[in-house]
Curated annotation (Swiss-Prot):
Keywords, sorted A to Z: ATP-binding, Cytoplasm, Decarboxylase, Gluconeogenesis, Lyase, Manganese, Metal-binding, Nucleotide-binding
Swiss-Prot/TrEMBL catalytic activity: oxaloacetate + ATP = phosphoenolpyruvate + ADP + CO2
Family: Belongs to the phosphoenolpyruvate carboxykinase (ATP) family.
UniProt name for this protein: Phosphoenolpyruvate carboxykinase (ATP)
GO CC aspect terms: cytosol
Gene coding for it: pckA
Source species: Oceanobacillus iheyensis (strain DSM 14371 / CIP 107618 / JCM 11309 / KCTC 3954 / HTE831)
Binding-site positions, substrate: 54, 190, 196, 317
InterPro entries (alphabetical): PEP_carboxykinase_ATP (IPR001272), PEP_carboxykinase_C (IPR013035), PEP_carboxykinase_N (IPR008210), PEPCK_ATP_CS (IPR015994)
Recorded superkingdom: Bacteria
General function of this protein: Involved in the gluconeogenesis. Catalyzes the conversion of oxaloacetate (OAA) to phosphoenolpyruvate (PEP) through direct phosphoryl transfer between the nucleoside triphosphate and OAA.
């Protein structure tokens, strides 16, 4: 077990700490303290004020002798001095000592007992403590009796920093010290910071134990075959991994160890925008007693959630334990992945709907982490924006992206994993001209990939991107598979495809540590 310096805990008065309250006790506290309100579903709803999403500009990592040589310092991992951290920690503890009551949750991150991290979360707010209880792994009574936290999250949303004095970017701060093994959060009520800070911690610790930490969803078939789904927001990751014929391992964060795949979390933090029972029954029916709804608008009288109302934010969320879903595997551990699917929603309409990747191409596209974001303006003019996020989770990676890519490459080799790139975006033209690829076709492609039907099928090489396109996929029209054939204007297609290829090359320049074979696995067209 890791020896952790917890001298700071001596300064935190304990007579006002509620330890490991039950869901019922926390719901009671939330309502009594007027932190949230009860909804018709039985869930509690809380709002987060100014911050309705993460604050990446306010996230810093302490640069010291422990982190200095390991962390990939830069825009994502901004350094902060140890002295700045220590002073803020002292101030936050003094602030919490003045509170009438605070809340502590003890649990784990990581479903595989070999690699799990014992954690504790100390919260100013009861609703944040319920959120932590639902998102992380709750210990048994025996585990709780022997629990020794190896990482602590301290969350004090009511404490606002003074940048001029405290050395922060703003009144909000998310600070990680790998030496003290503390995450310090202040000035933001957005609960996602608690979840994602522990994910960042696991992305630092797990690779040191030969475990690849991944921002992906995962499910397992009836024969024990495991699939991973990587993809940025809006690519269909949640929709496609929720499959009635396969059991869910988890929806967001996983580790791939020498034993297989395991969920890092014990719950889900699902998007609620436009949620309906018809479209996403699994999520819709999981929202019940004990669930935390974040920034969801309610009907004043009935207290029914209105998932279509985005007046507070489009980033409305529900936090609930995995047990709220019927179709799960418990515990959340499974074997090695047979299939990996990278999802992209390409608005240029030039990437193939499905292609089979070599190991080198898999590492290239993993590092690229490409999708399109659709930026809307008030006049309704939308200009798609090519977005690249390394390893499909750049904001949460303390180490160099190439470290995770190398681990992925080794594991693909070791376990002979098939990797596919599936485009859930546009066909027959770019956004505004073409059409979104039908979900039924995408599901057919995913099904064929998972069933092994495409492993030895004849392929066509894409002339721009160098990708291997299956000549036939059951349930999908053959002409849809080759993007150029779906465009009326072939010249316009070539121009659009070449533009995207150059964006890939431009983005990849930053990966100076990548090997030459990986660099060569990008688009064939180089301008």
């Amino acid at each position: 077990m890791k020896t952790v310096d917890k001298s700071y805990m001596k300064e935190l008065q304990t007579n006002h700490i509620h330890h490991n309250l039950s869901v019922a006790q926390l719901v009671e506290k939330i309502l009594y303290r007027q932190e949230g309100i009860l909804t018709s579903t039985g869930a509690v709803r809380a709002t987060t004020g100014t911050y309705t999403g993460r604050s990446p500009e306010d996230k810093f990592t302490v640069k010291d002798e422990v982190s200095d040589q390991h962390v990939n310092w830069g825009k994502v991992n901004k350094p902060i001095q140890e002295e700045v951290f220590n002073q803020l920690l002292s101030k936050v503890i003094s602030y919490l000592n003045e509170k009438q009551e605070i809340f502590k949750f003890q649990g784990f991150a990581g479903s595989d007992h070999t690699y799990r991290l014992p954690i504790q979360v100390i919260n100013e707010y009861a609703w944040h403590n319920l959120f932590s209880r639902q998102l992380f792994i709750t210990p048994t009574e025996e585990e709780l009796n022997n629990h020794q936290a190896e990482f602590t999250v301290i969350s004090a949303p009511g404490f606002k920093a003074d940048p001029a004095i405290d050395g922060t970017n703003s009144e909000t701060f998310i600070l990680i010290s790998f030496k003290k093994r503390i995450v310090l959060i202040g000035g933001t009520e957005y609960a996602g910071e608690i979840k994602k800070s522990i994910f960042s911690v696991m992305n630092y610790l797990l690779p040191q134990q030969d475990v690849l930490s991944m921002h992906c969803s995962a499910n397992v078939g009836q024969e024990g075959d495991v699939a991973l789904f990587f993809g940025l927001s809006g690519t269909g990751k949640t929709t496609l991994s929720a499959d009635p014929y396969r059991k869910l391992i988890g929806d967001d964060e996983h580790g791939w160890s020498p034993n297989g795949v395991f969920n890092i979390e014990g719950g889900c933090y699902a998007k609620c925008i436009n949620l309906s029972e018809e479209k996403e029954p699994q999520i819709y029916n999981a929202i019940r007693y004990g669930t935390v709804l974040e920034n969801v608008i309610l009907n004043d009288n009935s207290r029914e959630p209105d998932y279509d109302d985005t007046s507070l934010t489009e980033n409305t969320r529900a936090a609930y334990p995995l047990e709220n879903i019927d179709n799960i595997i418990n515990p959340s551990v499974a074997g090695h992945p047979n299939t990996i699917i990278f999802l992209t929603a390409d608005a240029s309409g030039t990437l193939p709907p499905i292609s089979k990747l070599t190991k080198e191409q898999a590492m290239y596209h993993f590092l690229s982490g490409y999708t399109s974001k659709l930026a809307g303006t008030e006049r309704g003019v939308t200009e798609p924006l090519a977005t690249f996020s390394a390893c499909f989770g750049s904001p949460f990676l303390p180490l160099a992206p190439s470290k995770y890519a190398e681990m992925l490459g080794k594991k693909i080799d070791m376990f002979d994993t098939n990797v596919f790139l599936i485009n859930t975006g546009w066909t027959g033209g770019s956004y505004g001209v073409g059409d979104r690829i039908k979900l039924s076709f995408t599901r057919a492609m995913v099904h064929s990939a998972l069933e092994g039907e495409l492993n030895s099928i004849e392929t066509i090489t894409d002339e721009i991107f160098g990708l291997q396109i299956p000549a036939h996929v059951p349930g999908v029209p053959d002409e849809l598979l080759v993007p150029k054939q779906t465009w009326g204007n072939k010249e316009a297609y070539m121009k659009e495809a070449q533009t995207l290829a150059l964006k890939f090359h431009e983005n990849f320049k930053k990966f100076t540590l990548a090997s030459e074979t990986i660099k060569q696995a990008g688009p064939l067209y180089k301008g």
